[in-house]
UniProtKB/Swiss-Prot annotation:
Family recorded in the similarity comment: Belongs to the inositol monophosphatase superfamily.
Keywords attached to this entry: Hydrolase, Lithium, Magnesium, Metal-binding, Phosphoprotein
Required co-factors: Mg(2+)
Organism: Homo sapiens
Protein name: Inositol polyphosphate 1-phosphatase
Length: 399
């Protein structure tokens, strides 16, 4: 299992290289945007985009995993279709070929004969990427490969990726929008139980060199299986344990701290915003991208990511859910939380990843229908939910 996670870290870095390469030239980037077909549109946005970068990343992840772990590819699922129609009306199925030259030739068809762009992309796609992590390298965990399913969101926050804002200032470490909100999400789950087991979140655009204007990224991972919990922030947390501001909000003093912080979507319902302002005061942050908002919880920048609508999907939440599980947290169904009586001692309604929504079509089959709350500390979540319910209008807790 740690071999699979190691490989996922490598392919996520290769994916990040592709995402960065596609942003290097504005002229090239204009070629890479194709509006999504009606059945594939995410209804939250009036206009949604499918990019060649999206599809390339998804195919690179699929085919690299297939090469290293034959059979696993049939359980890799994602948002993107790998079919393109070029300006000449040709329908092309995009795949990773065995050589750089063949991939460049196929990409050239998608890009209407643009050889320079095609060759540049093929070079990045076929580049070997090494990734080492001392914590992971010292671990060996075995799990049957045939119980694993993988959700991939090749480029989450596509709108921010296309817009490409590079000079957005953060608010207490949280970016409201811009390239920093773009993430590559890979979540591994148990296909029998739907429980998330491993997660990788790669943030391709973290800091930009002022001289070269090239971007550097950051990668986060977590593993939670059969009582073993590990994550990439362990070293950061242990270094900070001596101070009052350590990451992680664990321990009794954190559980009873009266102040909460939350990250939300700018499109969040006014009723939720009003209740949150009574619970969190001015510690509410708006940010783009479900993956990025979840990452803010992973990083300990906020206690909670809350979203009341049904426009996030399994590929948006699985990676962060696995990392948060490894940290003692999770992602739960908001609607079920609001309807639950905490006095009955029922388990928190964790999201699961193996079951379609009954009666739904298209991408809605995999929507997180009840909304979600991502958290790092169960005690903090219980206290937060109690306060949220008290501050919501009575009707809102049952909608």
């Amino acid at each position: 299992m740690s071999d699979i996670l190691r490989e996922l870290l490598c392919v996520s870095e290769k994916a990040a290289n592709i995402a960065r390469a596609c942003r290097q030239q504005e002229a090239l980037f204009q070629l890479l945007i194709e509006e999504k077909k009606e059945g594939e549109k995410n209804k939250k946005f009036a206009v949604d985009f499918k990019t060649l970068a999206d599809v390339l990343v998804q195919e690179v992840i699929k085919q690299n995993m297939e090469n290293k772990f034959p059979g696993l590819e049939k359980n890799i699922f994602g948002e993107e279709s790998n079919e393109f129609t070029n300006d000449w009306g040709e329908k092309i199925t995009l795949r990773l070929c065995s050589t750089e030259e063949e991939t460049a030739e196929l990409l050239s068809k998608v890009l209407n004969g643009n050889k320079v762009a095609s060759e540049a992309l093929a070079r990045v796609v076929h580049q070997d990427v090494a990734f080492t992590d001392p914590t992971l390298d010292s671990t060996e965990i075995n799990v049957p490969q045939d119980i694993l399913g993988i959700w991939v969101d090749p480029i989450d926050s596509t709108y921010q990726y296309i817009k490409g804002s590079a000079d957005i200032k953060s608010n207490q470490g949280i970016f409201p929008c811009g390239l920093q909100c773009v993430t590559i999400l890979i979540g591994v789950y148990d296909i029998q139980t739907g429980v998330p087991l491993m997660g990788v979140i790669n943030q391709p655009f973290v800091s930009r060199d002022p001289n070269t204007l090239r971007w550097k990224g950051q990668c986060y991972w977590g593993l939670s299986y059969m009582g073993t919990n590990m994550h990439s922030l362990q070293l950061t947390i242990s270094r900070r344990n001596g101070s009052e501001t350590h990451t992680g909000n664990t321990g009794s003093e954190a559980a009873f701290s009266p102040s909460f912080s939350a990250v939300i979507s700018t499109s969040e319902k006014e009723t939720i915003k009003a209740a949150l302002s009574r619970v969190c005061g001015d510690r509410i942050f708006g940010a783009a991208g479900a993956g990025y908002k979840s990452l803010c919880v992973v990083q300990g920048l906020v206690d909670i990511y809350i979203f009341s609508e049904d426009t996030t999907f399994k590929w948006d939440s699985c990676a962060a859910h696995a990392i948060l599980r490894a940290m003692g947290g999770g992602i739960v169904d908001l609607k079920e939380c609001l309807e639950r009586n905490p006095e009955t001692g029922l388990d928190l309604p964790q999201l699961v990843y193996h079951v379609e929504n009954e009666g739904a079509a298209g991408v809605d089959r995999w929507a997180n229908k009840g909304g979600l709350i991502a958290y790092r500390s169960r005690k903090r979540l219980e206290t937060f939910l109690s306060l949220l319910v008290q501050n919501l209008a009575p009707a809102e807790t049952h909608t």
